[in-house]
């Protein structure tokens, strides 16, 4: 009783040294438990992250194996070749390497069909056909497809009239394609059924305003090619010129009317070739040197795509940009490398 009274002052009990040490040990135990819990959680997190890393590495290895797995082209029936950059440096510089000629000939010997595709509209179709046949690349005009030629066929197929009236904003190449074709009439006065846009370095507002009036009165809008802008020369001026797509975008915005694109990578030009050859996309191959047009367009239709490090030429044209990551089914350094897969 005396010791209890001595340890009480003002109704409070003093804590003995032994009591303090007990509380301290309890606190230490609690802290240790928390540390152990944190370490355990961290360990679980680390083990999960390690497992995740291992899984990712395994998937990457599997993907690499799949990519490295060689594809077979033996069942393919139609081989479509880009012209500028794969067959010739440029249609304006028509020289074809010997190994390119030999490769195409070997593909023919294996019983395959071949086609040659270009977004060209600055040069008329008949001239492109002449060049490719004179070089020994193409056997006939039926194997050759240009944006200009397909644009003419598209207008004829979509018109509700026997002979559609067409207003063309372009340089001579595309204009000639429409002028010499039976079944269409090139006009410079109303009424107009189709407004077709190509590339024109001396474009003026009078043409644009007339095109807009025609669209507002019911004409359809068609873009021939697939170019934002390009480098070129006109008279004494050398530099950048506006392409067909921005002109169509402007007229489409002003008139509120959509437009059809004729040219890689859009499906109309690929679909036209497949229809002409009566080939299913699964049995066709596209060989090109540009991801944004050749490869992207082929993959959209289920056509096997091959990227070739061809003849570096495209000095005059800037490809249309795309934010999507596009990978070809096969990459080769030289066109002759394709023979190993057929």
Locations of regions flagged by a protein language model:
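Arg/Lys-rich, intrinsically disordered low-complexity tails that mediate electrostatic binding
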Residues: 1-58, 63
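Conserved phosphate-coupling serine/threonine residues in phosphotransfer and NTP-handling enzymes
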Residues: 118
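Asp-based, Mg2+/Mn2+-dependent phosphohydrolase catalytic module
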Residues: 63-94, 100-101, 105-110, 121-126, ...
């Amino acid at each position: 009783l005396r010791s209890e009274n001595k340890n009480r002052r003002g109704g409070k009990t003093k804590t003995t040294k032994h009591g303090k040490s007990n509380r301290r040990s309890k606190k230490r135990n609690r802290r240790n438990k928390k540390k152990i819990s944190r370490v355990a959680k961290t360990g679980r997190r680390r083990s999960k992250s390690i497992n995740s890393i291992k899984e990712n590495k395994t998937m990457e290895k599997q993907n690499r194996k799949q990519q490295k797995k060689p594809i077979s082209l033996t069942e393919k029936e139609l081989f479509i070749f880009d012209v500028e950059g794969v067959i010739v440096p440029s249609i304006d510089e028509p020289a074809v390497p010997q190994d390119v000629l030999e490769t195409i000939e070997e593909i023919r010997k294996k019983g395959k069909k071949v086609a040659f595709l270009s977004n060209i509209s600055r040069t008329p179709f008949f001239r492109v056909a002449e060049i490719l046949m004179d070089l020994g690349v193409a056997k006939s005009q039926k194997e050759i497809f240009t944006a200009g030629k397909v644009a003419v066929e598209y207008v004829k197929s979509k018109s509700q009239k026997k002979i559609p009236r067409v207003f063309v904003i372009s340089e001579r190449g595309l204009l000639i394609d429409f002028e010499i074709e039976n079944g269409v009439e090139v006009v410079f006065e109303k009424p107009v059924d189709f407004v077709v846009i190509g590339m024109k370095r001396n474009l003026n507002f009078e043409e644009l305003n007339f095109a807009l009036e025609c669209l507002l009165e019911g004409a359809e809008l068609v873009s021939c090619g697939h170019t934002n802008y390009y480098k070129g020369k006109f008279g004494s001026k050398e530099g950048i010129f506006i392409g067909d797509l921005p002109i169509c975008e402007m007229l489409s915005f002003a008139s509120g009317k959509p437009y059809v694109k004729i040219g890689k990578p859009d499906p109309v030009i690929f679909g036209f070739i497949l229809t002409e050859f009566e080939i299913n996309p699964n049995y066709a191959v596209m060989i090109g040197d540009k991801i944004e047009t050749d490869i992207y367009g082929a993959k959209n239709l289920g056509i096997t795509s091959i990227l070739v490090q061809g003849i570096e030429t495209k000095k005059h044209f800037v490809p249309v940009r795309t934010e999507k990551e596009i990978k070809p089914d096969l990459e080769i350094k030289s066109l002759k490398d394709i023979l190993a897969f057929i």
